[in-house]
Structures are given as structure tokens and as C-alpha cells.
Amino acid sequence: MDQDFFDTVKNYFRTKYIVFEFKNYSDRITQKEIFTTEKYLYEKALRKVAIIISRSGADAHALWAAKGSLRENGKLILCLSDQDLVEMLDMKDRGELPAEFLSAMLDDLLMHLEK
């Protein structure tokens, strides 16, 4: 079993726990939801990583806020949509590892993180 994503967040983000938040909104989540989730992330409690799952994913402002949280506070917030979950299930059906989807998402975020 590939643990690359989980090993990465454990070792590089120094976290033991991942906060999962589910938003059943018909619209994309906004920066408001990112800022709210960010408040749950606390280094001393060993939780610096969150995954927000929502029906339609995140809007551009939410993604910008998630990048800002990572850049300024070292808090990782990934946003998944229903379609992302379907893709992860399809990966599992094909014998692939769904965690690779999360690894690719993390790599993309880190490679495009501005100063």
C-alpha cells in the first residue's frame, strides 16, 4: 500500500491528524470556508492539514486563501469535489492507489505556490 501522501503530510507538515470537513453546498466553497477551517488547524495539537470535501469544489478565491494559509502559516488545506472522489474511486477500481490523486494535488499546489 502506497503511503506516500500520508507519509509526506506526517513528515513534512509535522501532523498526526488530518481534519476532514464536509460541505453540502450546491455552489463552490469560498474563502470564508477556508478561513473557518484554518482555525481548526493547530500545530501544538498536531493537526496542520485539512481536506475539505464539497459538492462543486472550491472557487478561485478559496484556492487563493488555501495557498495563503500554506505560505503564511504552514497549514495545508486541500479542496476536493464530488468529481474528485469519483476519480479516486475509479482509480481504486483500476487497481491504482487513490492516495496518488492526493499526492498529485499536493505536488501541484506546492509547485505553483508563490512567494
Positions of PLM-derived features:
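Mixed-charge (Asp/Glu-Lys/Arg
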Residues: 1-115
